[in-house]
């Protein structure tokens, strides 16, 4: 593959086994194995000053992103939701790996000035993210198995052993999470966040992991990073219903929502939750509002490295959700 002297803007669709790449508008997309060796070889063919738009897919995009950044290229990681909305905006119906690679290249070419370049996460971030996701998948599988096998008496002993093994694996993952948090020097931040009523170990880990990933101007930016901000479609006098943007890590959002359910039953948040229910909010809406409040408070504690002081919270109507 000949090396051009002109920098390119490439799109990279990532999957577990391979990467599909659109390296220039007038070329056909091609695939390479998603391995360290193959990625390193391809990056050597790129001209200096080139940029890559890579779709965030679980953790399958990380090897390419890290190697490309280390090699001096500008990397933009695009989440799937944003890419989907861009596809709709240009009325593109086809969706294959090749089409996605071309779409990423086009998106980078047209929108680059408004995009923020990707930088590697701090030490421990990737390990924490992987462990949280693996635990979530394990819990999901265990729950599904318990539901589907609940009435089966014939294989009850076998299922009991399997369920016990899965629970042990879950506990092992949580133990490793604690070790990684300690190795990354995040114990103090974790302790601060866990002081919030309703916030347990796993939710605190997710919030600390999110906070360490970027520099946030304020709590609004942190809430938006978590995908807990509200977006509203509007045209003229018409306005649609507000919906969560759902950017960012879905597992952290799930943990935060679960924390709000737990928190709504505490003395600290009972009045807050009841206030929004009396205003006519549905249960889910009230819990999301509480989840956002928890996220904002966690942000404040981490940013100022302060401990939670319950006496400063007066309850009732929130000044800022």
Positions of the model-derived regions?
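Short, solvent-exposed helix-loop connector elements
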Residues: 90, 116-129, 151, 240-244, ...
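Acidic, carboxylate-rich catalytic segments that either coordinate divalent cations
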Residues: 267-321
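Nucleic-acid-processing active sites and adjacent nucleic-acid-binding tracks
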Residues: 25-54
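Gly/Thr-rich phosphate-binding beta-strand-loop-beta motif of the actin/hexokinase/Hsp70
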Residues: 2-24, 104, 205-206
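Acidic, metal-coordinating catalytic cores used for nucleic-acid/nucleotide bond scission
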Residues: 53-64
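Phosphate-backbone recognition surface of nucleic-acid-processing proteins
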Residues: 201, 206-283, 319-321
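Long, charge-rich intrinsically disordered scaffolds of nucleic-acid metabolism proteins
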Residues: 2, 76-196, 205
